[in-house]
Regions:
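Aromatic-lined carbohydrate-recognition surfaces of secreted/lumenal glycan-active proteins
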Residues: 75-83, 127-137, 152-186, 236-250, ...
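Conserved, mostly hydrophobic/aromatic
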Residues: 25, 33, 128, 197, ...
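Boundary/entry segment of secreted carbohydrate-active catalytic domains
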Residues: 1-26
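Aromatic-rich peripheral "rim/lid" segments of glycoside hydrolase catalytic domains that contact
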Residues: 277-291, 295, 299-319
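A solvent-exposed, charged loop/short amphipathic helix patch at secondary-structure junctions
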Residues: 43-50, 96-101, 144-150, 211-215, ...
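Substrate-binding cleft and catalytic face of glycoside hydrolase catalytic domains
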Residues: 28-47, 61-108, 112-145
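Aromatic- and acid-rich polysaccharide-binding/catalytic face
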Residues: 115-134, 140, 179, 183-219, ...
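Alpha-helical scaffolding within the catalytic cores
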Residues: 16-21, 112-116, 180-188, 223-228, ...
């Protein structure tokens, strides 16, 4: 299946393109599509989280896209995400983050997830994914983008457990938790409350720009055994991989160069500043995915694969 890229790029006109995009996904052999309905933080003090007109999909928009996905024999999954009117790293840094602020934040975020969980239930979505990386400062032992503590309350684990239980009271289907493969997993108390783990995967597969397909497949297996298997063994939960390797030189080694600096993969997506120095390489992207698929095929404990970053309005290659 695929995960659509929606955050910061959604427009109501997507409904015009969605059906053709879903046809393409189905024709490629996809069975699932992940939608990421968003709400926007419009203020830091107090934190206000609401759907922004024209930038966040309304419930009707998400419902219509799920129906179009179903019409193309695709299971719909919701991965609720947040955005802000500025970079989220700046938003978190500038927020007050005292006790009353955190209480307000969790209240607003709970309302957001309750809304999305109810929508998932009403539309018959196959699953809902929690654990949006953009709210990582609110996770237990959360940090800001500079690595400093976010000041999240000491009872953060209990707050997230309660939040998961709230979602489950609205939605009776499968709940997954997103974990970045490069980060430490959340506490067991959180993972024990969900059904499976959605492992966000952009792990380097080569130590150099010179690519060796066989060596990449071996490295992919080594990384899966080191990062994914321990999650399965410690939680007893299945793992779904969310693969993200852009079509740019350096993607397989984890460093797409632009002006001699490694660019974050998300900065290669539409509506971000152009990266003219990044070199297009569809071949490298293909080799990275082939290496991962070869490794996954030898590991039955991986229960699914999704390709992240599909852009519905047009067939694009990364900048």
């Amino acid at each position: 299946g695929v995960e659509l890229y929606q955050r910061d790029v959604y427009r109501p006109s997507w409904l015009t393109y969605a059906n053709e995009g879903f046809k393409t996904i189905h024709n490629l052999g996809g069975k699932q599509v992940v939608l990421s309905p968003t709400w926007t933080f419009t203020r830091e003090m107090p934190p206000i989280l609401l759907p922004a007109a024209g930038k966040d999909p309304l419930a009707f928009d998400t419902f219509a896209m799920l129906q179009q996905a179903k019409a193309n024999q695709l299971e719909g999954i919701l991965f609720p995400r947040v955005r802000a009117n500025k970079s989220l790293s700046k938003w978190w840094t500038e927020a007050k983050r005292d006790d009353s602020w955190w209480q307000s934040w969790f209240d607003r975020y709970t309302e957001f997830l309750q809304h999305q969980a109810a929508l998932a239930q009403q539309t018959g979505a196959a699953a809902i994914i929690l654990g949006d990386p953009e709210v990582a400062p609110a996770f237990p032992a959360g940090t800001l983008s500079d690595g400093s503590p976010s000041g999240v309350p000491a009872d953060a684990v209990a707050r997230w457990v309660n939040l998961i239980d709230q979602v489950r009271s609205f939605y009776k289907g499968e709940i997954l938790w997103a974990v970045n493969a490069s980060d430490s997993p959340p506490p067991q108390e959180i993972l024990s409350r969900v059904d499976r783990i959605y492992l966000l995967w952009s792990v380097p597969l080569s130590a150099s720009m010179e690519l060796d397909p066989a060596a990449m497949a071996v490295e992919a297996g080594h990384q899966l055994d080191g990062k994914a298997l321990p999650l399965v063994q410690s939680t007893g939960k299945g793992v779904v991989l969310g693969l993200e390797y852009p079509s740019a030189q350096g993607a397989a080694s984890g460093c797409v160069l632009a002006k001699d600096v490694c660019v974050r993969f998300e900065n290669l997506y539409p509506f971000h500043a152009d990266q003219p120095d990044a070199v297009l390489s569809l071949d490298e992207q293909t080799q990275a995915y082939n290496a991962m698929l070869a490794a996954v095929n030898q590991r039955e404990w991986i229960t699914g694969i999704l390709s992240r970053g599909f852009f519905v309005p047009a067939l694009l290659v990364d900048k």
